[in-house]
């Protein structure tokens, strides 16, 4: 099982070595900006490495939005991110589900997601990530994810399970992998994060493993059953220990 972390984009391979990571995730630009990613000077090095590199798309992306001033730039930067990810030989691009203005717009939001994927031109796999909060989110509640997947599942989109987000969404982590796989048929990547807040809080505040509100054994169980590469999106101080903890608990 590949276990690693989200690291600084400055020198991801060096960071992986320091943290003992088998796999890394990076941003290719400012995650809070609409500015397109710039080409990396180390693109050839990253493309040649045996270490899988995942890319997290900007947080601003919301292809489900009815607001064209949000939706159209979202589609554009998703395409630009996928293009930049291809340039470094990325394993996949991870993107949040986004949201709509109210529950009456959910079905249209699902269709906007489908249109965005149909228009996307890339050979890099794209993974939808479940999110922590939002009353009208596309990927917070599992029942809503199921409705979205009915519309987009056949496009070949993958799924990234974030443990903190599932906890914050109020979904809990008992049998979480089985429940998601019953919807999507797949889990391609796990973001293994503890949570600083109580279950159902709707707050996306990650904690190092064992230092938050989630029973560490539930995190280990989810990682084991998922059988997918794992990324710890936790604080740099303690992240090396998070990787070592998961590696010890999942070995053998």
Swiss-Prot record:
Cofactor note: Binds 3 Zn(2+) ions.
InterPro entries (UniProt xref): AP_endonuc_2 (IPR001719), AP_endonuc_F2_Zn_BS (IPR018246), Xyl_isomerase-like_sf (IPR036237), Xyl_isomerase-like_TIM-brl (IPR013022)
Cofactor(s) required for function per UniProt: Zn(2+)
Reaction catalysis annotation: Endonucleolytic cleavage to 5'-phosphooligonucleotide end-products
Residues annotated for Zn(2+) 2 binding in this entry: 129, 162, 191, 233
Source superkingdom: Bacteria
MF term (GO), any: DNA-(apurinic or apyrimidinic site) endonuclease activity
Pfam families per the UniProt record, alphabetical: AP_endonuc_2
EC number: 3.1.21.2
Positions of Zn(2+) 3 binding: 165, 204, 206
One example of a Gene Ontology biological process annotation: base-excision repair
Residues reported to bind Zn(2+) 1: 56, 96, 129
Keywords of this entry: DNA damage, DNA repair, Endonuclease, Hydrolase, Metal-binding, Nuclease, Zinc
Family statement drawn from the similarity comment of this UniProt entry: Belongs to the AP endonuclease 2 family.
Function as written in the Swiss-Prot or TrEMBL entry: Endonuclease IV plays a role in DNA repair. It cleaves phosphodiester bonds at apurinic or apyrimidinic (AP) sites, generating a 3'-hydroxyl group and a 5'-terminal sugar phosphate.
Protein name: Probable endonuclease 4
Organism of origin: Mycobacterium leprae (strain TN)
């Amino acid at each position: 099982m590949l276990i690693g972390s989200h690291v600084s984009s400055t020198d991801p391979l060096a960071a992986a070595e320091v943290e003992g990571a088998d796999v890394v995730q990076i941003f290719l630009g400012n995650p809070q900006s609409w500015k397109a990613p710039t080409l990396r000077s180390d693109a050839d090095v990253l493309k040649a490495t045996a270490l899988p590199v995942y890319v997290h798309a900007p947080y601003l992306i919301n292809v489900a939005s009815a607001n064209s001033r949000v939706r159209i730039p979202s589609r554009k930067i998703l395409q630009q991110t996928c293009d930049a990810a291809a340039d470094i030989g990325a394993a996949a691009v991870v993107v949040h589900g986004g949201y709509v203005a109210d529950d009456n717009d959910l079905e249209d939001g699902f269709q906007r997601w489908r249109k965005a994927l149909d228009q996307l031109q890339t050979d890099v796999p794209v993974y939808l990530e479940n999110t922590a909060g939002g009353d009208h989110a596309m990927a917070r509640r599992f029942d809503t994810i199921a409705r979205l997947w009915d519309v987009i599942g056949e496009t070949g989109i993958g799924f990234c399970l974030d443990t903190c987000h599932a906890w914050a969404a109020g979904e809990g982590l008992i049998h979480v992998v089985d429940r998601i796989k019953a919807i999507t048929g797949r889990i391609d990547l796990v973001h293994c994060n503890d949570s600083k807040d109580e279950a159902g809080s709707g707050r996306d505040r990650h904690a190092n493993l064992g230092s938050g509100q989630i029973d560490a054994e539930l995190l280990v169980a989810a990682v084991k059953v998922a059988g997918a590469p794992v990324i710890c999106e936790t604080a740099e101080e303690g992240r090396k220990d998070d990787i070592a903890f998961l590696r010890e608990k999942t070995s053998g």
